[in-house]
């Protein structure tokens, strides 16, 4: 731990030293001969002897400037040079740092026949709620797709799953030339569109894409827009890749894109077995917002192969895959403001996983341990189709989305747990169909009416077979048997419909909404034993379920929007009457629940200044459980966990409060934000577990329970013009308090996690780029009734160097170092290194790239994971070294 603190302290001192190295300032004003201020004049601080530029800036709107002077620099060794278009350049000596150095420039008399202005300094342009980054200011020759550039933009961060955030707020969409081709599956664009086809990246704050509602209904969404270059709009764009390597690896990417005003398309075929998980490209980054909008609790997958954990590594470090993805995305502007869009993909993969894990559960006076080794194979086939018709006019909006999803997944597992050998086959085939219709129309009175209708059907038949039989004493009265078969399915019909009426005014927009929703479900499950003579019977009378469920809801809502320029606010006051009926004749279960709820929500955004704002959020929400909270028969969710319910339906009161401040100074490319969040959940029941060395039984008891969560996080990003570097940092502190019952003991847990992040991206010269990122994570968990506690420290460092000696040759070297410390265990240290060389064959307009991934050939990885009183020690098999030769060309 001391070593970690020294490393963190060294990082902190490095940051401070960069700040302290500019300990003095010189300031002044720049005016013309009449005394009028000259904005945007270039002010250079130079060494009087060598004429080298020490620092520079530009004047603000009042003609003033401030220059940072390096520490321990004598004033008489410096001069200030001021340049402005149409005026003569003027140079002055500095007598001292206390007195201002003012300039009065005289206009040039001679006519300039030709003026060429070169400025390599990145500039952000602001216009209203839109901030514009010029791609060429931040790109480098090694950047192949636009996602490579977005990662380096000041104020923007990209998570490991591709989620983009601007000043710590996730973006809602990424538009392409102003059109929404992909909804929230924007990783398709960021991982495919060539960076050379994009002229600018725009950040749109307070994005309200529905024209009827603009300046009437508050939106605090943030979206990105990719501005396409003119020449890229005139032709088909494509970056093709064909690669092969050792041991038996391949990587193929064939794509064709079009970005015309009336037609946009991203269509491609990808396949690889190099650890590149193509499923990351079709991730929906805002699925939580979608589920909140449709207000439907989609049943989660119930069964699994075991408590598998994912290593905290980059995917290509540990993934054994054989992936293929056909992805088709096409948008046609039928006429002005009328669009037809088709998004479809088919994904096939075969993934292998070898890992071993020891799970330690710390109980009062006892410790339970599980040991398991698994050799897994997953074979998903995923189909997705979406048709969207959109009319988006000033007075009329129509949006209809037809969605169909089907997945056929078969998973195989060879499991060795303690003294048992088990083969598992798990089949999971979810099917989803839905149609979402939304109509908004502005009347002659300027009032707005809205009609909404959503209907869906969902089913997910699950089947898991475990063989040979194990735990005979529990499942078959001490008689040996052949197989244990668990089946589960929860088919669901759902519809949600409402009418809304909005009354806009200069100050407040009033909205009134009323509607209803109906959910109809049936949960069926059975745990069957296949005897050695192939006869089949239930494991017991309490391992079967047939639950019928109906939830009906009627609601009315009043909302008030203040869409001002300084103060934006939304107050929503919904009233809900819902009735839930559920029954299961197998357990003489027949219950009804009627509740009337009031769930107020308040959102406030106050513009402190032109670029800075304060946000407030409060949400009180009553939540009622789902059909998965009421089944009485046991379900074997994995090979060693039986779960059932004995309490009434779960009811929760969820309170969420948050406050945040966002700072931006576009002129100097400086961004920072800080947010605090508190979440309190009170429930009418509590989870209880009986844990033994052979099995874990879970059940829900009717006992009042609450959880509390506090989160504090901050981010900072600054571009240094002098160092040509984007510096970024982040910090997060989170505390979670919860209560569980384990082996009849009431255990309150407190888990605290802290994260510190520091990164830099430097353009050393036109030939050399360097990036560095360090992430320190600390997790500790303990129970008030037990003195024992766990504490884990993890440090990840990543560095990359790019070197382009000539235009046609590029070299890249990168590395990752993982360090984990947990008291009582040896330190875990891993280092991964990659290298590549790219050669441009100008005659063929083709690139050849030779790469070596994990060239140090690290083939195992150990990791520690902590949750409440459960510690998991896992060991994974890695693919090892991959050598790949790629042929890349454009069409």
Locate predicted features.
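Membrane-proximal, glycine/serine-rich, low-complexity loop/turn segments characteristic
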Residues: 35, 62-64, 72-73, 85-99, ...
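Transmembrane beta-strand segments that form the barrel wall of outer-membrane beta-barrel proteins
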Residues: 235-246, 265-269, 575-579, 645-647, ...
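Periplasm-facing N-terminal accessory domains of Gram-negative outer-membrane beta-barrel systems
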Residues: 22-110, 152, 157, 165-167
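Outer-membrane beta-barrel translocator domains and adjoining extracellular loop/strand segments
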Residues: 94, 214-215, 279-284, 352-368, ...
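Conserved C-terminal beta-signal and adjacent last beta-strands/turns
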Residues: 757-776, 790-891
């Amino acid at each position: 731990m001391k070593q970690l603190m020294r490393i963190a302290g060294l990082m902190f001192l490095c940051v401070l030293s960069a700040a302290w190295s500019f300990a003095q300032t010189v300031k002044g004003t720049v005016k013309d001969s009449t005394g009028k201020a000259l904005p945007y004049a270039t002010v250079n601080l130079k060494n009087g002897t060598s004429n080298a530029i020490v620092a520079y800036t530009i004047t603000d709107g009042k003609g003033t400037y401030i220059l940072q002077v390096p520490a321990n620099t004598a004033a008489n060794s410096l001069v200030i040079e001021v340049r402005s278009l149409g005026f003569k350049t003027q140079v002055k000596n500095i007598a001292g740092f206390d007195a201002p150095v003012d300039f009065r420039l005289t206009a040039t008399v001679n006519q300039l026949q030709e003026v060429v202005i070169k400025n390599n300094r990145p500039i952000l342009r602001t216009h209203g709620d839109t901030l514009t980054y010029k791609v060429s200011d931040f790109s480098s020759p090694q950047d192949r797709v636009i996602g490579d550039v977005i990662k380096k933009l000041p104020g923007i961060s990209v998570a490991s799953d591709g989620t983009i955030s601007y000043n710590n707020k996730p973006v809602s969409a990424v538009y392409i030339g102003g059109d929404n081709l992909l909804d929230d599956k924007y990783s398709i664009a960021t991982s495919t569109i060539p960076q050379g086809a994009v002229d600018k990246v725009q950040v749109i704050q307070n994005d309200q894409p529905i024209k009827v509602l603009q300046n009437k209904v508050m939106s605090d969404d943030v979206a990105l827009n990719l501005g396409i270059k003119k020449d890229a709009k005139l032709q088909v764009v494509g970056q093709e890749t064909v690669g092969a390597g050792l041991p038996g690896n391949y990587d193929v990417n064939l794509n064709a894109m079009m970005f015309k005003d009336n037609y946009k398309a991203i269509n491609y075929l990808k396949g690889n077995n190099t650890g590149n998980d193509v499923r990351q490209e079709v991730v929906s980054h805002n699925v939580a917002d979608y589920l909140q909008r449709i207000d439907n609790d989609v049943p989660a997958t119930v069964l699994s192969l075991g408590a598998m954990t994912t290593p905290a590594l980059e995917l290509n470090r540990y993934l054994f895959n054989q992936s293929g993805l056909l992805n088709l995305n096409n948008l046609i502007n039928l006429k002005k403001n009328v669009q037809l869009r088709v998004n479809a993909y088919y994904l096939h993969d075969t993934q292998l996983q070898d890992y071993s894990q020891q799970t330690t559960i710390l109980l009062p006076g006892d410790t339970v341990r599980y040991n398991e080794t698994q050799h897994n194979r997953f074979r998903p086939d995923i189909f997705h189709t979406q048709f969207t018709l959109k009319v988006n006019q000033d007075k009329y909006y129509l949006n209809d989305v037809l969605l169909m999803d089907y997945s056929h997944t078969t998973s195989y597992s060879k499991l060795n747990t303690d003294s048992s050998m088990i083969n598992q086959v798990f089949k999971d085939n979810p099917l989803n169909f839905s149609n979402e219709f939304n109509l908004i129309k502005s009347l002659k009175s300027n009032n707005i009416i809205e009609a909404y209708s959503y209907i869906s059907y969902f089913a997910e038949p699950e089947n898991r077979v475990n063989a040979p039989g194990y735990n005979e004493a529990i499942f078959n009265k001490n008689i040996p048997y052949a197989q244990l078969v668990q089946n589960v399915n929860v088919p669901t019909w759902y519809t949600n419909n409402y009418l809304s009426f909005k009354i806009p005014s200069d100050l407040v927009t009033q909205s009134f909404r009323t509607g209803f929703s109906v959910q109809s479900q049936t949960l069926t499950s059975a745990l069957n034993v296949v005897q050695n003579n192939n006869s089949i019977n239930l494991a017991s009378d309490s391992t079967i379920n047939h639950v019928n469920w109906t939830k009906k809801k009627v609601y009315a809502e009043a909302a008030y929007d203040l869409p001002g320029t300084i103060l934006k606010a939304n107050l929503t006051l919904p009233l809900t009457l819902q009735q839930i009926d559920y029954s299961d004749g197998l357990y003489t279960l027949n219950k009804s629940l009627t509740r009337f709820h009031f769930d107020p929500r308040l959102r406030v955004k106050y513009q402190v200044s032109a670029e800075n704002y304060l946000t407030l959020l409060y949400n009180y929400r009553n939540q009622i459980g789902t059909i998965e909270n009421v089944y009485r028969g046991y379900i074997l969710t994995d090979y060693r966990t039986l779960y059932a319910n004995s309490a009434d339906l779960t009811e929760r009161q969820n309170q969420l409060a948050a406050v945040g401040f966002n700072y931006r100074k576009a002129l100097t490319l400086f961004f920072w934000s800080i947010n605090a969040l508190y979440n309190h959940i009170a429930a009418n029941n509590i989870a209880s577990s009986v844990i033994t060395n052979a099995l874990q039984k879970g059940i829900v008891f009717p006992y009042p329970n609450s959880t509390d969560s506090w989160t504090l996080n901050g981010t900072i990003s600054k571009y240094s013009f002098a160092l040509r570097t984007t510096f970024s940092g982040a910090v997060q502190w989170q505390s979670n308090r919860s209560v569980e019952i384990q082996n009849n003991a009431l255990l309150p847990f407190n888990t605290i996690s802290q994260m510190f992040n520091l990164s830099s991206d430097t353009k050393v010269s036109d030939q050399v780029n360097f990036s560095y990122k360090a992430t320190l994570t600390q997790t500790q968990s303990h129970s008030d009734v037990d003195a024992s506690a766990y504490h884990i420290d993890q440090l990840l460092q990543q560095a990359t160097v790019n070197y382009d000696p000539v235009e046609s040759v590029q070299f890249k070297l990168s590395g990752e170092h993982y360090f984990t410390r947990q008291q009582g265990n040896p330190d875990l240290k891993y280092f991964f290194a990659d290298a590549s060389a790219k050669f441009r064959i100008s005659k063929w307009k083709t690139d050849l790239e030779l790469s070596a991934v994990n060239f140090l050939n690290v083939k195992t990885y150990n990791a520690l994971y902590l949750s409440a009183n459960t510690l998991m020690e896992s060991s994974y098999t890695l693919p090892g070294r991959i050598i790949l030769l790629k042929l890349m060309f454009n069409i």
